[in-house]
């Protein structure tokens, strides 16, 4: 299909082959300076957020105080940021949608659609969300000429790069509109997800006692008793596992999930042990619901609840609270305290935690009934966060797939 210049997926009623155009044939460069100070809003381009207020994005002002020599960009106009990043290996091309106008450094290449009756602005936005244009930039960027991540791309060469597009404006518009709606849905779910994360962080601060206090700021109705402080080791049994010798193939490939620290919240594992591997090593079994605490490396301080019955290695501490203590409550406290634990016990984030350190941690506990109420509240909140995260990932995967199949 691609050889015929037709995409794999199209809207009904469109059959013509797409055409290849030079960017400069459908857009025109803008070199308008901000001489009359029409705008004092400094902009930057983020691969994720598009054209955005520079002060908010960097949390400080990067632009000069005098912006009269900057390009003036108006709503609906485009800009190419030649700076590269992991998200934008060949820079980013975005349209100004958030503000009526703003100013950009003259290092950017600014342009607008020449004739919006023939070229859909939304289509151009979407096209530059694909990676189809990267090859053209790669061809014109001067070899080795990267100055602090800034590509050496001349404006004249930039406008000579190719893009493919439907001849029919109606098809362009439908494609652009489809992705604009998809982006709107993604933004809605992202906002809900972000709000829930902020809510959880705030409630974790308010529903557990602060240092020096014996009660929290917010409590469920009906609970008035003071809380008591106990060490993790006093209220639970805990143990770490081990790793069977990797050179013995008979120890691996069995039916026992082998949970490693990056998998403490996962329902699947990459490795499986045999009964022989379990027997001939320090690996220990855990049950569904056990608290799993990561001790080593990049995941130090991460907390999970076992999603499956399996074995753990030495990088994980399994914690099983006694019957008077709620697992979910303790897991939430450990999550809330991750930053302070890392700061206290790991110098500069380096090194490992240990079972001894975790068992000595002091935790504030209310009655079991109140623990269960708090743990249940945060479990529901976590489920809601996970739901929005999955929806977000699903929509992002749909977008990625459609960007690949609806363009040539």
Protein language model annotation of sequence segments:
Residues 10-34, 219-242, 267:
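Non-catalytic DNA-recognition/assembly elements of restriction-modification systems
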Residues 3-7, 102-107, 142-171, 310-317, ...:
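A short glycine-rich beta-alpha junction/loop motif
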Residues 67-135, 154, 260-262, 270-335:
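A short beta-sheet element
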Residues 127-147, 331-348:
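Charged, low-complexity intrinsically disordered regulatory segments in eukaryotic signaling
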Residues 62, 68, 148, 280-281, ...:
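A structural connector/turn signal
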Residues 27, 33-63, 103-104, 233-236, ...:
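DNA target-recognition patches
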Residues 1-19, 168-228, 369-408:
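Amphipathic alpha-helical segments with low aromatic content
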């Amino acid at each position: 299909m691609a050889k015929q210049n037709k995409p794999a997926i199209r809207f009904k009623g469109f059959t013509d082959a797409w055409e290849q155009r030079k960017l400069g044939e459908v857009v025109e460069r803008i070199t308008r300076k901000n001489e009359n100070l029409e705008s004092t809003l400094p902009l930057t381009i983020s691969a994720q957020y598009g054209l955005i207020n520079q002060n908010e994005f960097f949390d400080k002002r990067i632009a000069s105080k005098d912006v009269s020599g900057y390009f003036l960009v108006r709503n609906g106009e485009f800009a190419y940021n030649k700076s590269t990043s992991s998200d934008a290996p060949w820079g980013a091309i975005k349209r100004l949608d958030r503000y009526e106008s703003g100013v950009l450094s003259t290092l950017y290449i600014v342009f607008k659609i020449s004739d919006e009756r023939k070229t859909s602005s939304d289509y151009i936005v979407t096209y530059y969300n694909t990676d189809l244009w990267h090859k053209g930039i790669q061809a014109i960027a001067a070899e080795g000429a990267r100055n602090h991540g800034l590509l050496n791309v001349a404006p004249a060469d930039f406008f000579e790069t190719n893009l493919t597009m439907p001849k029919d404006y109606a098809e362009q518009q439908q494609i652009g509109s489809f992705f604009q709606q998809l982006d709107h849905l993604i933004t809605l779910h992202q906002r809900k997800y972000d709000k829930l994360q902020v809510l959880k962080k705030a409630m974790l601060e308010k529903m557990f006692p602060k240092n020096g206090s014996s009660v929290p700021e917010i409590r469920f109705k009906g609970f008035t008793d003071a809380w008591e402080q106990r060490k993790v080791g006093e209220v639970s049994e805990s143990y770490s596992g081990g790793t069977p010798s990797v050179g013995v193939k008979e120890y691996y490939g069995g039916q026992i999930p082998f949970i490693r620290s990056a998998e403490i919240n996962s329902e699947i594992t990459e490795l499986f042990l045999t009964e022989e591997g379990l027997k001939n090593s320090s690996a220990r079994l855990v049950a569904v619901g056990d608290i799993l605490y990561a001790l080593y490396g990049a995941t130090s301080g991460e907390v999970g609840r076992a999603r499956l019955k399996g074995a753990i290695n030495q990088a994980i501490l399994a914690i099983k609270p006694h019957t008077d203590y709620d697992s979910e409550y303790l897991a939430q406290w450990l999550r809330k305290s991750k930053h302070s634990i890392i700061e206290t016990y790991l110098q500069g984030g380096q090194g490992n935690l240990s079972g001894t350190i975790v068992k000595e941690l002091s935790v504030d506990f209310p009655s079991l009934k109140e623990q269960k109420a708090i743990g249940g509240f945060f479990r529901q909140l976590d489920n809601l966060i996970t739901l929005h995260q999955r929806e977000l990932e699903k929509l992002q995967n749909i977008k990625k797939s459609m960007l690949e199949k609806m363009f040539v």
